[in-house]
Amino acid sequence: GGARLSDGELANGHFYGATLLSNISADMLIYREETFGPVAAVVPFDDDDDVIAMANDTRYGLAAYVYTQNLARALRTFEQLQFGIIGINDINPTSAAAPFGGMKESGLGREGAREGIEEYLETKLGGISI
């Protein structure tokens, strides 16, 4: 269930309070879709391979976040995740100087940085013999 906020700052519906969801199953939309809002779904897992498989089990792949103190685990997880942006112990791994974009159905190409402008350029090759 849920309830409509009726008082306080959030009563007018312009904001959504941070929400943590548990008891999530793979058939729920929150498990499969990209939710743009302050919502986090908590899903238990057995090991790294299990959680990586669950994370990649989606048509989308904009951003993923990993929290660990183990550098080897962080690098291994980074390599296996199918997301365009991955924050390791970082909630904001992007910058204006970095290429921004997702994988799968989260978009093609990149915005920003050199990779972003290259899609708008025409390359020419010329050869001259005199």
Predicted ranges, named:
Residues 1-9:
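Short, solvent-exposed loop/turn elements at beta->coil junctions and helix N-caps
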Residues 12:
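Single, function-defining residue in the core of a domain
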Residues 15-130:
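Conserved C-terminal structural/oligomerization subdomain of aldehyde/semialdehyde dehydrogenase
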